Amino acid sequence: MTQLIMGIDPGTLVSGYAIILVEQRYKIRAHSYGAIRLSSKDSLTQRYKQLFQTISGVLNDITPDAVVLETQYVHKNPQSTIKLGMARGVLVLAAALRDIPVFEYAPNVAKRAVVGRGNASKQQVQLMVSKMLNIPDVLNANCEDIADAFALAICHAHTSSYDFLGVR
């Protein structure tokens, strides 16, 4: 039995997504990944629309068994929190319209699942994801969001493995 898990690191300018294939007990492979890059010149409404359309296209091509997002956290700037929350809402809606369950994990929980420490740096997450899944290009400077998305998907694979395997 296999399972596809999609992690998404949401953003109003860049959203990373990563899909892993989970086979048997903890056998995890990278399936596909990418970054949705939006223009700061576009209105927020236009960016949300483009984010929705792009992630919908990915979900139509590859229907994962679960979508995983970071939990909402509060920025120092309340407007940033609201804007990010709206981007998350667009992503949740895209999954919900396809009856794909959505799960959330705090960033420190996802980091702990991959690096072993909840306060790991983005570079440490990139390095561990690269090594775990044998994807050297995730080490590129512009792939932090993709590495975070992989970390979320891996976190869910580890957290849900007992339910996935029918073990409690």
UniProtKB/Swiss-Prot annotation:
Its main location: cytoplasm. Its cofactor is Mg(2+). GO terms for biological process: DNA recombination; DNA repair. It is found in: Cytoplasm. PROSITE patterns: RUVC. The keyword Nuclease applies. It catalyses: Endonucleolytic cleavage at a junction such as a reciprocal single-stranded crossover between two homologous DNA duplexes (Holliday junction). Its EC number is 3.1.21.10. Mg(2+) 2 binds at E70. Pfam families: RuvC. It is an enzyme of class 3 (hydrolase). Binds 2 Mg(2+) ion per subunit. One of its GO terms (cellular component) is cytoplasm. The keyword DNA damage applies. One of its GO terms (molecular function) is magnesium ion binding. InterPro entries: RNaseH-like_sf (IPR012337), RNaseH_sf (IPR036397), X-over_junc_endoDNase_Mg_BS (IPR020563), X-over_junc_endoDNase_RuvC (IPR002176). Mg(2+) 1 binds at D9, D145. The active site is at D9, E70, D145. Keywords: Cytoplasm, DNA damage, DNA recombination, DNA repair, DNA-binding, Endonuclease, Hydrolase, Magnesium, Metal-binding, Nuclease. The RuvA-RuvB-RuvC complex processes Holliday junction (HJ) DNA during genetic recombination and DNA repair. Endonuclease that resolves HJ intermediates. Cleaves cruciform DNA by making single-stranded nicks across the HJ at symmetrical positions within the homologous arms, yielding a 5'-phosphate and a 3'-hydroxyl group; requires a central core of homology in the junction. The consensus cleavage sequence is 5'-(A/T)TT(C/G)-3'. Cleavage occurs on the 3'-side of the TT dinucleotide at the point of strand exchange. Belongs to the RuvC family. NCBIfam families: ruvC. Homodimer which binds Holliday junction (HJ) DNA. The HJ becomes 2-fold symmetrical on binding to RuvC with unstacked arms; it has a different conformation from HJ DNA in complex with RuvA. In the full resolvosome a probable DNA-RuvA(4)-RuvB(12)-RuvC(2) complex forms which resolves the HJ. This is Crossover junction endodeoxyribonuclease RuvC. It comes from Chlamydia felis (strain Fe/C-56).
